[in-house]
From Swiss-Prot:
Pathway: tRNA modification; N(7)-methylguanine-tRNA biosynthesis
Region annotated Unknown, chain positions: 1-221
Compositionally biased residues, Low complexity: 23-47, 106-117, 140-150
Top-level taxon of origin: Bacteria
Protein family membership: Belongs to the class I-like SAM-binding methyltransferase superfamily. TrmB family.
GO molecular function, one term: tRNA (guanine(46)-N7)-methyltransferase activity
Lineage: Bacteria, Pseudomonadati, Pseudomonadota, Betaproteobacteria, Burkholderiales
Compositionally biased residues, Basic residues: 48-86
Span list, region Disordered: 1-150
Function statement: Catalyzes the formation of N(7)-methylguanine at position 46 (m7G46) in tRNA.
Region described as tRNA (guanine-N(7)-)-methyltransferase: 222-469
Protein name: tRNA (guanine-N(7)-)-methyltransferase
Organism name: Methylibium petroleiphilum (strain ATCC BAA-1232 / LMG 22953 / PM1)
InterPro entries reported for this sequence: SAM-dependent_MTases_sf, tRNA_(Gua-N-7)_MeTrfase_Trmb, tRNA_methyltr_TrmB_bact
Length: 469
């Protein structure tokens, strides 16, 4: 460490050679800690030494020391207006010393030049200022954050030149604004006609030409989408169910792992072969939405000469029915865990079912959700095509408005015939389900509808909707 003309200085700013306080080269910039302005002689106060102590010489690591000093400066922020700042330099770096500002300087003395503060005391630029200039929004201040770029795309990338020509590129998309065109020598740049603006791309089969008249200009031929042609992609079908997460018991999990490979049929786009699936050819009944499978297992156990295919999307219900299959040792029951509409379209052959069970489907109580109800005219037509002549369709619900809709839709199908005058009594083969027992406890009624597919489609029928007591 270098000092003044007499020798290196100590922590108090005194010359180590003379061991006394004096003004001279020893108190210059070469000393490790120069005596602040306003202290002509004597020892430097201890509080000043504590502020001026180097971080590396402090107890512990420099990171903890800087944190402690930063918190101390925060507590003394209230007195910052009465204190000045003086900087001292040594070979270890730049430190900032907080001393009291003197009222006046001695004659001939000059205030010390301010030095660059320590890195911990320098203000850090904002996040937007540290970002590259290419991602900065035009006209944004350095300290303000940029708007989020959603999904990595912007409006200009989605709509191409049309968005830039409409002058909407100054949004928060984060893209660079298009460069302005150079001014022409003859005058300002003329505006391009509206007919020259590019339009979004669309297949030629779906475009039709129409004439649009713009004020002050000649008629312009523009292309519009043709609503008469079919859309490029088919609309997404409305699902009648919502997958919800449910708990799986240990017995259901074990049954799903042990019996699933044998009794759960994977979805395929080819019709099922009953000889391969059941090992025989017998009447088949298709059940839509068996829930936890209690009623399905009882019906399959009571009718061993009939093969049953249950369709369910919820995994806990599939595991519960597999557990029932293992306990009852059923061999005439299989499960498909998939959407029933797609299963009917691809896995069930037309005219191959002896019966269809639809017990207590989701009623979708709200009016805006009635479109999600399973019993709709289009779905009933699909069911009729899969029924064999003389096959039956058995529906049950505990929601009276839904029962009325079922009776109306099924009665309007010309290929079905009601087996009763209105609602039918509960057949002997159908046991009380969990939903039915809950409805009876709440005082709700239960309505069964049994329709059969007659031999000739030209036969006429009339159904009278009456409520059973």
């Amino acid at each position: 460490m270098r000092g003044g003309a007499h020798g290196p200085g100590d922590r108090a700013g005194r010359c180590r050679e003379h061991r006394q306080d004096h003004a001279g080269p020893c108190a210059g910039a070469g000393a490790p800690f120069a005596r602040p302005a306003g202290h002509a002689g004597g020892r430097v106060p201890a509080r000043v030494l504590r502020r001026a102590r180097p971080h590396a010489a402090a107890r512990g690591t420099g990171r903890h020391r800087r944190r402690a000093m930063a918190s101390h400066r925060g507590r003394r922020a209230g007195r910052s207006h009465r204190a000045g700042r003086h900087h001292a330099a040594d070979d270890r770096g730049l430190q900032r010393v907080r001393v009291r500002r003197p009222q006046s300087l001695p004659p001939g003395a000059r205030a010390p030049a301010p030095l660059r503060p320590h890195a911990a005391d320098r203000p850090r630029p904002g996040l937007a200022a540290r970002r590259p200039a290419a991602r900065r929004r035009p006209g944004a201040r350095p300290g303000r954050p940029l708007g989020p770029r959603r999904a990595g795309l912007c409006r200009a990338a989605l709509f191409g030149g049309l968005w830039r020509r409409l002058g909407a590129h100054g949004s928060r998309c984060g893209c660079a604004a298009p460069a302005a065109a150079p001014a022409r020598p003859g005058g300002p740049r003329a505006r391009r006609p509206a007919a020259a603006w590019p339009l979004p791309r669309m297949p030629a089969a779906r475009m039709r030409t129409s004439v649009v008249r713009v004020r002050g200009e000649a008629p312009i031929a523009m292309s519009e989408p043709d609503s008469s042609s079919p859309p490029a992609h088919p609309p997404r079908p409305i699902r009648s169910f919502v997958l919800r997460a449910g708990r799986m018991g240990s017995g259901q999990t074990r049954a799903l792992a042990e019996l699933g490979p044998r009794f759960v049929l994977p979805f395929q786009r080819e019709p099922l072969d009953p000889q391969t699936v059941f090992g025989r050819r017998a009447p088949r009944v298709f059940e839509i939405g068996f829930g936890m499978g209690d009623a399905t297992a009882q019906i399959a156990a009571a009718r061993p000469d009939t093969d049953f295919i249950g369709c369910e999307v919820h995994t806990p219900g599939v595991g519960a029915l597999l557990k029932q299959i293992g306990e009852r040792e059923l061999t005439n029951l299989r499960i498909v865990q998939h959407d029933a509409v797609e299963v009917l379209d691809h896995m069930i052959e037309p005219g191959s079912l002896a019966g269809i069970h639809l017990f207590f489907p989701d009623p979708w109580h709200k009016k805006k959700h009635h479109k999600r109800r399973l019993v709709q005219p289009a779905f009933v037509e699909r069911l009729v095509t899969r029924l064999a002549p003389g096959g039956y369709l058995h529906c049950a619900t505990d929601w009276q408005p839904y029962a009325e809709q079922m009776l109306e839709v099924l009665g309007a199908e010309p290929a079905l015939r009601n087996s009763a005058d209105g609602y039918a009594p509960r057949p002997e083969y159908r046991p009380l389900t969990k939903f039915e027992q809950r409805g009876l406890r709440l005082g709700h009624g239960v309505w069964d509808l049994v329709f059969t597919k007659h031999q000739g489609r030209s036969a006429s029928k009339q159904c009278t909707a009456t409520s059973s007591p």
